[in-house]
């Protein structure tokens, strides 16, 4: 009770509690919400600004990027430039052909190609590729997914573990001969498939380029929706228009299937070529590839979301390559061809050319180095026929004979062992038991004094050998001995250096690939003792070999007074007119002086006088009198080289190379020529080299100097 009473009293004393004032806490929710709204607003404004920037400022760029993701540019071929002769006649042109093409999509499978190839083969006449290999046929068979699965089941466990490429190779080996024994219709489809399969992703190849009919073009166009990647277009083929002898000089162009030759593939790829581009593979077409190559056409290919081709549109038709105008005239070239053919055929018919490998002639302009004609014919031993071989004028070399003797005189003058028009006694040169002599003085019964000029007129071997001996420090006396080969090196060098200054034994610089420089045997490859006399043979043209072009450059160098000009077959590079024909000049090929012969005017005059006297001199032994009746005044130097052979029975047959170099008119030459007729029977007395030279000079006169 007491406790209860105390609590009551205590409660009465405190009295009732007054109510406390109600306490309110400030809420943070509205602030956070407002801040969030502000951030959203700011982002929204930023988005609007960015969209505006993209749409207004950078809209074109964005549009291009979007387009680029769905549109791909593909390049196609363009016609090569044409080749014309000096008169403007087309020698090589492009023949346009309707074509059926294929552009490979990004995701096209072998099965896709197979289905398209089969459909297309039913719509067009497709010639079967004669070069279809077993591998091509097996690839065609395996393109069918069911066949691929069937062949894959034949793999061993070990073969299944191989990488993708190796496993496919193993699968190919499992295809049987019976499975690739196709019908003609299937072979047509296989041909189409092979060409389609050669295309890289988003590249275009030609399926059919010849004999495409209007009906085939129409039916392909009608069915394009069912032929993914197939289209129609235009292709070109290279056609030589005039002059069969120019075909080899012009060269060839690879096909699309051949593409870029392996040996120059990397070089061309770096220049932006594609692997299957058609390029020049020989001679003019190769030398002037970058000039003749056209600018490729450009097409836009639209892709759908699955990277399949939706459409294809040409945006740039391409541009034909630039054109070449040559220095030679097809009409003069044809005349030279006929002159060689007619004269050499007579030698074949008479048996004189039985062992001859052919006949070659080159004509140059000695004022510019321009090639006026290059003609050659190859002949097989015992044959009654000949084949065009103009390239033999600069890739085949022969022993020249006495035509080189101006080079020997030059070596004597340049090395201080010969004085001006010095007189030497023509006599047989006896080295030990060996005897070498001039044709007109084989035994010494016709010993006579000759000046340097006369030595050219009558073609003195003795004079030239004495110059060579002087280069060794020897004044000739009968029965002397000469140094062994290993001590003659500087003499070979001196003679060959002088020869090279005229163009013999060195590159002429012709604007054609594959030029030969002839054969110059080094002293390291000679017998020190038995070959000791070869240096004398070199002095009168019986040792080293030269091309017909080198001899023509030599003749031109004598004709113009000592300037060795670089020969060139291209006179200028031209663009195209509106019709694709010959346009205006882009680049003129100017004369290039490679070197000047190190002779004085007086020394060069002695050489020119000697060449003139060989034709017009009064000496009974003047070697080229047959040219005196030419329609223009001609200077010349003949050459006869002994080139015996041993036949299959072991018999030695005496043969000679009959050669000549000439130029005219003598006082101001417009043409310089070289003619080489190797390995004719030694009993040839008709001087066919002189006859051919006369006919060529007369043909030039009739065409350009009348």
Residue ranges of predicted features:
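A short acidic/glycine-rich loop-to-helix N-cap element
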Residues: 678-692
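Membrane-proximal periplasmic segments of bacterial cell-envelope enzymes
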Residues: 1-290, 296-310, 316, 468-472, ...
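Short, basic/aromatic recognition patches
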Residues: 63-76, 332-354
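Active-site His/Glu-centered metal-binding helix of metallohydrolases
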Residues: 52, 403, 407
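Solvent-exposed, polar/charged alpha-helical surfaces in well-ordered, non-transmembrane soluble domains
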Residues: 111-122, 218, 222, 247, ...
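Gly/Ser-rich catalytic serine loop of serine hydrolases
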Residues: 80, 394-404, 543
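Beta-lactam-recognizing serine transpeptidase/beta-lactamase-like catalytic domain environment
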Residues: 90-93, 98, 302-317, 328, ...
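Short N-terminal helix-loop-first-beta-strand/juxtamembrane motif that initiates sensory/input modules
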Residues: 80-83, 227-231, 349-364
């Amino acid at each position: 009770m007491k406790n209860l009473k105390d609590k009551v009293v205590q409660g009465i004393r405190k009295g009732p509690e007054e109510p406390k004032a109600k306490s309110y806490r400030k809420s943070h929710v509205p602030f956070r919400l407002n801040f969030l709204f502000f951030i959203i607003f700011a982002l929204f404004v930023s988005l609007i600004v960015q969209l505006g920037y993209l749409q207004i400022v950078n809209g074109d760029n964005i549009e291009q990027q979007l387009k680029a993701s769905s549109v791909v540019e593909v390049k196609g071929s363009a016609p090569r430039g044409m080749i014309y002769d000096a008169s403007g006649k087309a020698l090589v042109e492009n023949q346009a052909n309707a074509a059926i093409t294929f552009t490979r999509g990004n995701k096209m499978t072998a099965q896709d190609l197979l289905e398209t190839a089969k459909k297309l083969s039913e719509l067009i006449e497709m010639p079967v590729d004669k070069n279809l290999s077993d591998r091509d046929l097996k690839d065609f068979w395996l393109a069918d997914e069911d066949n691929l699965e069937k062949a894959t089941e034949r793999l061993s466990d070990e073969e299944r573990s191989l990488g993708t490429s190796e496993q496919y190779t193993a699968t190919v080996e499992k295809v049987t001969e019976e499975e690739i024994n196709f019908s003609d219709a299937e072979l047509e489809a296989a041909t189409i498939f092979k060409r389609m399969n050669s295309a890289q992703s988003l590249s275009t190849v030609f399926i059919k380029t010849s004999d495409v009919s209007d009906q085939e073009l129409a039916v392909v166009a009608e069915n394009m929706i069912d032929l993914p990647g197939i289209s129609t277009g235009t292709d070109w083929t290279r056609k030589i228009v005039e002059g069969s002898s120019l075909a080899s000089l012009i060269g060839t162009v690879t096909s699309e299937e051949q593409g870029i030759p392996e040996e120059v593939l990397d070089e061309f790829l770096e220049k932006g070529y594609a692997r299957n581009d058609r390029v020049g593979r020989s001679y003019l077409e190769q030398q002037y590839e970058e000039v003749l190559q056209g600018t490729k056409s450009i097409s836009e290919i639209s892709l759908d979301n699955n990277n399949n081709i939706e459409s294809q549109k040409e945006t740039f038709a391409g541009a034909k390559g630039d054109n070449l105008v040559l220095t030679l005239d097809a009409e003069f070239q044809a005349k030279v061809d006929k002159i060689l053919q007619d004269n050499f055929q007579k030698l074949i018919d008479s048996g004189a050319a039985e062992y001859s490998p052919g006949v070659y002639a080159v004509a140059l302009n000695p004022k510019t180095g321009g090639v006026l004609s290059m003609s050659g014919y190859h002949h097989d031993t015992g044959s009654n026929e000949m084949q065009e071989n103009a390239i033999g004028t600069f890739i085949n070399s022969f022993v020249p004979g006495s035509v080189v003797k101006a080079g020997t005189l030059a070596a004597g003058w340049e090395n201080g062992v010969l004085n001006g028009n010095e007189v030497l006694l023509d006599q047989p040169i006896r080295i030990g038991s060996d005897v070498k002599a001039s044709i007109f003085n084989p035994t010494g019964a016709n010993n006579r004094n000759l000046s340097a000029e006369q030595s050219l007129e009558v073609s003195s071997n003795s004079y030239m050998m004495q110059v060579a001996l002087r280069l060794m420090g020897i004044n000739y006396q009968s029965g002397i001995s000469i140094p062994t080969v290993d001590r003659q090196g500087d003499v070979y060098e001196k003679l060959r250096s002088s020869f090279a200054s005229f163009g013999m034994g060195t590159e002429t610089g012709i604007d054609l690939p594959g030029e030969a420089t002839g054969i110059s045997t080094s002293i390291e490859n000679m017998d020190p003792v038995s070959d000791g006399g070869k240096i004398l043979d070199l002095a009168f043209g019986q040792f080293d070999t030269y091309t017909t072009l080198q001899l023509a450059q030599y003749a031109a160098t004598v004709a113009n007074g000592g300037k060795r000009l670089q020969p060139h077959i291209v006179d200028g590079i031209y663009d195209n007119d509106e019709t694709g024909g010959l346009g205006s000049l882009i680049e003129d090929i100017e004369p290039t002086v490679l070197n000047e012969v190190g002779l004085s005017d007086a020394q060069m005059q002695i050489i020119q006088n000697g060449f003139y006297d060989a034709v017009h001199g009064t000496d009974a032994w003047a070697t080229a009198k047959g040219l005196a009746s030419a329609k223009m005044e001609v200077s010349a130097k003949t050459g006869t080289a002994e080139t015996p052979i041993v036949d299959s029975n072991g018999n030695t047959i005496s043969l000679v190379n009959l050669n000549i170099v000439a130029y005219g008119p003598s006082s101001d030459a417009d043409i310089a020529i070289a003619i080489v007729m190797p390995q004719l029977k030694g009993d040839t007395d008709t001087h066919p080299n002189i006859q051919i030279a006369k006919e060529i000079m007369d043909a030039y006169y009739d065409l350009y100097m009348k």
